[in-house]
C-alpha cells in the first residue's frame, strides 16, 4: 500500500514537473514572440511634424525620381535589426507608389559601434562606384557577419569593379565627413532611435510597418494635391 502511494506521488510530482517545464517553454517562446513582434511589427511609431523637412533630403543617397511628390528620408544603421526589417518595406512602398515616392538614405550609426560606422563608410565608397543600392542590400543581408566579412569582398559581390580604389576610399577623410554630416543631421532632427523616417514633413521614430507607411505616403500625396 505504501509502495503504491509512494509510486503515485512520484508520478504526480513528475507530471507536475513536466507540465511546469512545458509551460515555462511556452512562456519563454511566446515572450520572445511578443517582444519581437510587439516592438518590431505591432507598436506604432512615434510621429511628429517637422517644419523645415525639405532640407533633410538634400544630402544622402536618393533612390527614386528627383521630382517625386513624396520624399522619405531614412536615417538608418546597418547593424540595427529594425533598420534591416525597414529596408524591404521602403522598397515595397517605392514600387507601390512608383514615380511618386523617392527614398533618401542617410547614416545614423551608433556612436558605440565602430562596425556600423565602418559599414557606413564602406557603402559610401561603393556609391563612388555607382553601387550604393546593391551594397546597401548586401550589408543588411550579411548583417550577422559584418565586421568579420571583408568590406572589399562585399564590394566585389556588389559589382564594384575597382576594388583597389574602393580600399583606398575607405581611408578617405571626406567619406568620414559625409557620414558625420548625416549623424549631425539626425541629431538636429531629433532622430533618437533607428530607423527614423521623415515622410515629407512627418517624422516617424522607430520601425514603421507597411500599412502605416502607406498611410503616411497617401496623406502626403493628398496634402501635395491640395496645396497645388
PLM regions: where:
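Cysteine-centric redox/oxidoreductase cores and disulfide-bonded domains
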Residues: 7-11, 28, 35-36, 109-228
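Extracytoplasmic thiol/disulfide redox context detector
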Residues: 2-112, 171, 177-193, 219-228
Amino acid at each position: 500500500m505504501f509502495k503504491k502511494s509512494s509510486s503515485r506521488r512520484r508520478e504526480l510530482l513528475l507530471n507536475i514537473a513536466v507540465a511546469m517545464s512545458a509551460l515555462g517553454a511556452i512562456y519563454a517562446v511566446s515572450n520572445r514572440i511578443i517582444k519581437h513582434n510587439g516592438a518590431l511589427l505591432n507598436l506604432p511609431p512615434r510621429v511628429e511634424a517637422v517644419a523645415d523637412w525639405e532640407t533633410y533630403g538634400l544630402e544622402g543617397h536618393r533612390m527614386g525620381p528627383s521630382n517625386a511628390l513624396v520624399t522619405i528620408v531614412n536615417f538608418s544603421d546597418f547593424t540595427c535589426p529594425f533598420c534591416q526589417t525597414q529596408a524591404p518595406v521602403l522598397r515595397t512602398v517605392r514600387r507601390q507608389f512608383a514615380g511618386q515616392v523617392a527614398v533618401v538614405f542617410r547614416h545614423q550609426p551608433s556612436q558605440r559601434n565602430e562596425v556600423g560606422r565602418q559599414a557606413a563608410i564602406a557603402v559610401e565608397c561603393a556609391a563612388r562606384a555607382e553601387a550604393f543600392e546593391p551594397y546597401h542590400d548586401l550589408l543588411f543581408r550579411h548583417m550577422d557577419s559584418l565586421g568579420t566579412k571583408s568590406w572589399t569582398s562585399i564590394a566585389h559581390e556588389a559589382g564594384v569593379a575597382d576594388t583597389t580604389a574602393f580600399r583606398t576610399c575607405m581611408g578617405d577623410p571626406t567619406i568620414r565627413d559625409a557620414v558625420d554630416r548625416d549623424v549631425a543631421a539626425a541629431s538636429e532632427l531629433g532622430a533618437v532611435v533607428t530607423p527614423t523616417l521623415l515622410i515629407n514633413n512627418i517624422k516617424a521614430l522607430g520601425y514603421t510597418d507597411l500599412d502605416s507607411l502607406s498611410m503616411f505616403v497617401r496623406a502626403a500625396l493628398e496634402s501635395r494635391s491640395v496645396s497645388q
